From Swiss-Prot:
This is CinA-like protein. Belongs to the CinA family. NCBIfam families: cinA_nterm, molyb_syn, PncC_domain, PRK00549.1. InterPro entries: CinA (IPR050101), CinA-like_C (IPR036653), CinA_C (IPR008136), CinA_KH (IPR041424), Competence-induced_CinA (IPR008135), MoaB/Mog-like_dom_sf (IPR036425), MoaB/Mog_dom (IPR001453). Gene3D superfamilies: 3.30.70.2860, CinA-like, MoaB/Mog-like domain. It holds the Pfam family CinA. It comes from the Bacteria.
Length: 411
């Protein structure tokens, strides 16, 4: 069965909203063994929406459309879909009852637009919406399947999981299962070179490399009759990849670099503080994304000005005179200074030239030094980054966390 995901909403075309629904649905459909062949995005325009449906059903057996089920005049997915299949819209009394109760519980007045949401395509089955007002629809017609779901992810995802997944499970023959390995410290091309022969030789499982900002990803995917069988197929491939990439692999699945770092600190019973210059708090922000970080993270100082580095971090003035603020010597002293000031086992620092001004031939834009202090031992990493200011700061943050990870692994 060929499936197509149709995302409806002018806001998606304008880039005002990130299309996370399509990403989510593609992943889940793959888990169910239903291949997605096309993604289409169309605005809230009746003619273009109808054309999108025509194209979708000319090449796909099933179309899952999200968005355009709301109460406003430009929410037309249901109406255009009914027109496409030459069907009428009919009032679904149970949905109307649920919508009325939804508004009564909140002390709100029901509008004509909300009543419109209770209409469904003739001959379709309703997908109840226990998280909002717009019910979904499943329509089987002429060997084709149309599934309509609301656009808000907080409604779409639970509706899909609760009601659509059981329906779709009857169509899947086997499953597609993937495992993701997350890599840091090497670029996508270098990583791919390390496993190039595996990528070429593997057909099931397959190995696909992807680039992510400052990181790289390897997705290993197997098609099998069951999840257990797929996991066994993947296991040997993952073992060989780990053998080749070693500690460049920092995690699996949705694990973030900062989660790995915080878990290492917790495991080793260490505390950390951070001194930041060019990153301006980005490293600290990433750390505090992790629940439970308060057990290991004591605080940070944004020491942008040299005077702050001297007074707050105890960086000797001679460092600036002899080496400058952007130097390995300064980075290490910043890391040592913050650790001693905060009374932590570990200190991490970053100093560099993020641009667009301030670079010289000797010290160009993108030159960054990351300092690491762990219980009296100091080390550093030099980076020569390219791109705009935001990219340099982001890559510095990622490399800083990775240097910290490696330092902790070596303890």
């Amino acid at each position: 069965m060929r499936c197509e995901i149709l995302s409806v909403g002018t806001e998606l075309l304008l880039g005002d909203i990130l299309n996370t629904n399509a990403q989510y649905l593609s992943r889940r459909l793959a888990d169910l063994g239903i291949p997605v062949y096309f993604h289409t995005t169309v605005g809230d325009n009746p003619e273009r929406l109808k054309k999108a449906l025509e194209i979708a059903f000319s090449r796909s057996d099933m179309v899952i459309a999200t968005g355009g089920l709301g109460p406003t005049q430009d929410d037309l997915t249901k109406e255009i879909s009914a027109e496409f299949f030459n069907k009428k819209l009919v009032l679904h009394e149970e949905s109307l009852k649920r919508i009325k109760e939804f508004f009564e519980r909140r002390g709100l007045n029901l509008t004509e637009g909300n009543i419109k949401q209770a209409y469904i395509i003739e001959g379709s089955r309703v997908i109840p919406n226990d998280w909002g007002t717009a019910p979904g629809i499943i329509l089987e017609e002429g060997g084709k399947i149309l599934i309509l779901l609301p656009g808000p992810p907080k409604e779409m995802i639970p509706m899909f999981e609760t009601y659509v997944v059981p329906y779709l499970s009857t169509f899947s023959s086997g499953i597609i299962y993937s495992k993701v390995l997350r890599v840091c410290g090497i670029g996508e091309s270098f990583m791919e070179e390390k496993v190039k022969d595996l990528i070429k030789s593997q057909t099931n499982p397959t190995i696909a490399p992807y680039a992510k900002e400052g990181e790289a990803i390897l997705r290993i995917t197997a098609r099998a009759k069951s999840k257990e069988e797929a996991e066994k197929m993947i296991e040997g491939v993952v073992k060989e990849i780990r053998k080749r990439l070693g500690d460049y692999i920092y995690g699996e699945g949705e694990t973030s670099l900062e989660e790995v770092v915080v878990n290492l600190l917790l495991e080793k019973g260490l505390t950390i503080s951070v001194a930041e210059s060019c990153t301006g708090g980005l490293i600290s922000a990433r750390l505090v994304n992790v629940p439970g970080v308060s057990k290991v993270f004591k605080g940070s100082i944004i020491a942008y000005d040299n005077e702050v580095k001297i007074k707050e971090l105890n960086v000797p003035e001679e460092i600036f005179k002899e080496y400058g603020a952007v130097s390995s010597q300064c980075a290490m002293k910043m890391a040592e200074g913050i650790a001693k000031k905060m009374g932590t086992d570990v200190g991490l620092s970053a100093t560099g030239i993020a641009g667009p001004e301030g670079g010289t031939l000797e010290k160009p834009i993108g030159l960054v030094y990351i300092g690491l202090y762990i219980r009296g031992e100091m080390s550093y990493k030099e980076l020569r980054l390219s791109g705009d200011r935001n990219r340099i700061r982001l890559y510095t943050t990622i490399n800083g966390l990775d240097l910290l990870r490696r330092g902790l692994l070596n303890l």
